[in-house]
Amino acid sequence: RIRKKARYVDERKCTGCGLCWLKCPVKRIPSEFDAFLGTRTAIYTPFPQAVPNVPVIDRENCLFFKRGTCRICEKVCPTKAISYEQEDEIIEEMVGAVVLATGYDVMDADEFGELGGGRFKDVITGLQFERILSSSGPTSGKILRPSDKKEVETVVFISCVGSRERYKGIEYCSKICCMYVAKHAMLFKHKNPKGKAYVFYMDIRAGGKGYEEFVRRAIEEEGVIYLRGRVSRIYERDGKLVVRGADSLSGTQVEIPADLVVLATAIRPKEGAESIAQKFHVSYDSHGFMNELHPKLRPVETATAGVFLAGVCQAPKDIPDSVAQASAAASKVLALFSSDELEREPTVAIVDESTCVGCFACESVCPFGAIERKEVRDRAGNVIKVVSHVNPGLCQGCGACVVACRSQCIDIEGYRSEEVFAEIMAL
């Protein structure tokens, strides 16, 4: 069951001409796609490459939904595609496989007050700097300070902001930060060759093909200055941000006046990913990343048959790794659909109906919904008792029901007590 939210625009009639958002009077809403550095209207297309390329009305900011007035987009639409009467729909689809690719969120700069996050407008995240660099971004590719729109001459990048910090609750490495910081620093130098770029880092983890050479190029050819050490404080002085930190290689403290500070904040699982994992009976770790069936042999499969993983929902990874994993997941799905019959593991639970007392404790603990209730009848057709029955098509052989059974009437096929004892006696 899929909830399709109402967009209040008829996809069959809309041609994507853009007249509606050009005429919309509500124009100062922070844009999610531009990381809240730019603005959008109350009717908008989420991003230029959206599929379908049809706008959606933000009902929380639309004057019609707030006050019952306006309707300008409806009046100017040449195809009469605006439909304020639309409602959310529940769509039911029968599918043979599911690929979970929920993506990730980045930690917000506001969570790092000691680094100026939330206090200074010119302290931004790497994602925001990415949008500033883009020619279709809020500044049309010009590197300008968010506070006063002046050109940036000195920029300081701070790596591992939130990553590998136990007190922030994120002990893992975000994996992508070292490389995108090097990329951002190089792009800044390309756009402003006379500008200065500094990078504070703890360790450079450039473990991919050509990654180490890329970082060396940033240092040796582009003149990016790397300082190994932590930043202790950021404060304002004479209209600039002063970054105070340590250079552990020289054993000195440094202060750098900067126009812009970019925080390489940690990545974490997408909000709501745990809820989705629970719906599909997929386990996840303490950080919220979904668990694969086997880290080496079955890296894109899960404990639930027919459910596969792709991208950062499984662990932090960059674009090449995400594409490779998505291709592997798609191949697994095609392999699943290529045969007329589906294979399953023989190690499924089986119930001894003669000893089952019908307490159904197993039913409540089964994460896959494989336990069903079965009526046992005599020769006359009268119901003698109701017992548990395992659907072998759904059972994954996890053994949760075996542990929960009070009368010890459930076993895993191939692992019954008498079979295990026989194997031991044969040694």
Regions found by a protein language model. Name each.
Residues 1-427:
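Residues forming the flavin
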